[in-house]
Amino acid sequence: MTTRFDAITLEVLWTRIISVTDEAAKAIVRTSFSTLSNEANDFACVLTDARGYALAQNSGSIPSFIGTLPATVRHFLREFGEDGLKPGDVLITNDPWQGTGHMSDVSLVKPIFHRERLVAFSATTSHMPDIGGRVRAIEARELFEEGIHIPLSRIIRDGQRDETLIRLIRANVRTPDQTMGDIWAQVSANELMENRVRRLMEEYHLYSLEGLADELFGRSERAMREAIAAVPDGTYRYGFQTDGFEKSYTFKIALTIKGDEIVADFTGTSPAQPRAINCVYAYTYAMTAYAVRCALLPGLPNNEGMYRPVKVEAPEGCLLNPRFPAAVVSRAQTGHYVPVLVLGALHKVIPDKVMAGAGSPLWAVAQTGTRDDGRPYTNVLFFNGGMGATSGKDGEHVLSWPSNISSTPVEVAERNSPLFFHYKRLRAGSGGAGRHRGGLGQDILVESGSTRPIVLSFMAERTKFPAPGFKGGGAGGLGDVRINGRKVDHRRQHVLARGDRVLVSTPGGGGYGPARARAAALRLRDRLLGYIGGKGG
């Protein structure tokens, strides 16, 4: 028998479910050991129904995880079967093809039982401070170089920890206390979601969540289909080149809208590479659906129904759908271009609903070394470029898109590693010119204060091909990495000695509309605030 929900009750229940994931997210921030979770926001909490379909994701989360985490739940369901799951089980994996796309993210899933019946799953994923292997080396040529690979497994069985698996993980990472501390923080968040869901079901006398889920999914799907149907039918194409390694890479999309469905076809994209920038299909799909949602229905909370009208085709063996065991640790360097492709195609038909190219993909510096007491450490610092401008607004400065990851505060970064920050400031002139200017990137100058070598691995893009402007807008400024004033190859690892200085300059966002149409008052404001200088602006 299907339970019917009136509009008010449905809104109350949906809001309650979202609040459950938000509370779990706060628990991770408060209890995790590494800055990747408690400062950089590189984690997510998701609730699914018993079928593995997403009910809600915590607010302000990483957008890709709403597409990947529910798929991970369904992989566990296929592996163990509903009958093979028990109360007290906690499942774990970091398999890129069955998880979030790279092994740095560890996903935990807990089946939720109510009155001895499987009713839901709580799922979390978090970027580990270390997972072994090479230090986030973009030079890796296959998965086996990138760390310990945890297949679909149980870390807790019927309430009992698997001490063998725990010892195996600890033995293969540089920071075992931090890594396991973050995993236990996830376990706590999973258990919190379980308790809150069971309390909710008792309060509203719910025997199952499927009726509620189907009602939410149906309403969200109808809303998305209506938004798609409002866009004229047709196939809209877009493409560009990216930095690459020895040569640049090509990205292409053919976005077909027919009625109330949308199909993104990435045929023509460069083949998978023997480098760690390949992006698995699940991540490609998630980023595609996210971009469609941003353009067409940005205000509706995430759930399974929103994504049902969105289809993705990516040829097997291309950069956006690599075969195992392709190297994938820096998959964001590829996957973050997907939303730009989608919005680039859509700007030809709904220009007022999209933004120009952003200074993304996300930039990061992974560092590893040894403390004075001999203990190894690892640390990852994220940096952001400028956002693209839109038809009605300048791009935001130094904002993470599409990843939604926060930059680690300087004080925290200096506390956790022997780096000293000389400055962190906006890059004048890095925003693309236009009727609306692209957002500015930033300059970050750091110095090594360590008496021991520090190994750096960079994750950087748009050092050769800038963020594109739309409708006559100018391109954003290029990014750059320099050590002691000399431009370096950011694709290679570099070793810092005491006193060495690193200047990281992130790219700016593209402009929108011709620069000659920019209002005089805005030009004056740009000059007064120091936003103009060099190229762009």
Each language-model region and where it sits:
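Glycine/proline-enriched, intrinsically flexible loops and inter-domain linkers
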Residues: 1-87, 92-114, 118-263, 267-537
